[in-house]
Design a protein with these regions (language model features):
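Glycine-rich beta-alpha loop elements in corrinoid/cobalamin-binding modules
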Residues: 4, 21, 25-28, 32-163
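Residue-level recognition of beta-strand->loop/alpha-helix junctions
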Residues: 9, 39-42, 211
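Short, solvent-exposed loop/turn segments at secondary-structure boundaries
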Residues: 17-19, 75-79, 216-220, 251-252
Length: 301
């Protein structure tokens, strides 16, 4: 039997947002030979019974928990998620001794502080597709893992943080997108999520994306992006949100993705939304977006 890794989505915010990172991470772990389970707590009102139920039937070598956001980004409610994360990790400690590894965009904003608050020892800041399988391999083999890229770990001086490894997204295989129940998220949340690139070179004072995704823009192949759209279309998901920091940067890549959507005949089948920068943005690009099925843009300034 392959060594089993449990991925946990602790995000119970509504309307629900699919944990895209866990779909990508599940593919990477599967390609490395691990058996992967997903415990998605989004659709349960109470998480304790679900954790108890899972561990009454399963044992795992490691647990990876994604923190997508540290709060709900809503001025009216200002719901801070880290205390609830600690409640969940404290509960996990009752039922398993497997290493708990934190990660995700929210975690990457302040990894040492979150690990300290939760009383945990390990996390991955930045991208996890390379580092998480390597870390789990070292844990299973009982080998030293302190040089794993992007690792944040407890040390004698408090916490140590390794530089991350940023992936070559052009050669990234198309994720299977079958770990997460994307169909349910679509039905209850309204759209699916997809990523065409990572990184942002801008230095906006309000934005944390460069902390999690880096400052160098790395683009996926347009074919790979649209292949992934096709995968989700097969399960009935036809509204998408591009999670890129700025979908139109660089403009040539945005254009090529749109042209590939049109070439594949998807533009009449889908509607999509994206974050964009107002500069550079042309009328020509706007027309192409509309032809490719774009239904809305959020401009950040």
């Amino acid at each position: 039997m392959a060594d089993k890794v449990l991925l946990i989505n602790p995000n119970q915010m509504k309307p629900p947002v699919a944990p895209l990172a866990l779909d990508y991470l599940a593919s990477a772990l599967g390609e490395s030979g691990f058996e992967v389970d997903l415990l998605d707590l989004c659709f349960f009102e109470h998480f304790v019974p679900e954790i108890e139920r899972y561990f009454s039937r399963n044992s795992v070598f490691a647990i990876a928990i994604t923190l997508r956001n540290t709060d709900d980004t809503c001025f009216a409610t200002r719901d801070f998620f880290v205390p609830r994360l600690k409640e969940m990790t404290d509960c996990l400690r009752i039922y398993t001794s497997a290493p708990l590894i934190l990660g995700g965009s929210g975690f990457s904003i302040m990894p040492e502080s979150i690990l300290h608050y939760c009383g945990l020892d390990l996390g991955i800041w930045g991208e996890g597709e390379y580092s998480m399988p390597l870390l789990v391999e070292r844990i299973v083999a009982k080998e030293d893992y302190r040089d794993v890229p992007g690792l944040v770990y407890r040390s004698r001086k408090g916490f140590s943080r390794n530089p991350p490894k940023y992936l070559d997204l052009k050669n990234m295989p198309t994720p299977e997108r079958n770990a997460v129940d994307n169909r349910r998220y679509f039905l209850e949340g309204g759209m699916g999520s997809i990523e065409a690139k990572r990184g942002c070179s801008k230095r906006c004072i309000y934005c944390t994306d460069p902390l999690a995704k880096g400052r160098r823009v790395r683009c996926r192949s347009p074919k790979g992006v649209v292949d992934e759209i096709g995968t989700l279309l097969k399960v009935g998901i036809n509204h998408f949100h591009f999670c890129d920091s700025e979908f139109n940067l660089p403009p040539d890549h945005a254009r090529d993705v749109c042209l590939e959507i049109i070439r594949r005949g998807f533009s009449a089948k889908i509607r999509w939304y994206a974050y964009c920068s107002p500069v550079p943005f042309s009328e020509e690009l706007a027309v192409l977006f509309e032809r490719a099925g774009c239904a809305g843009i959020n401009f950040g300034v």
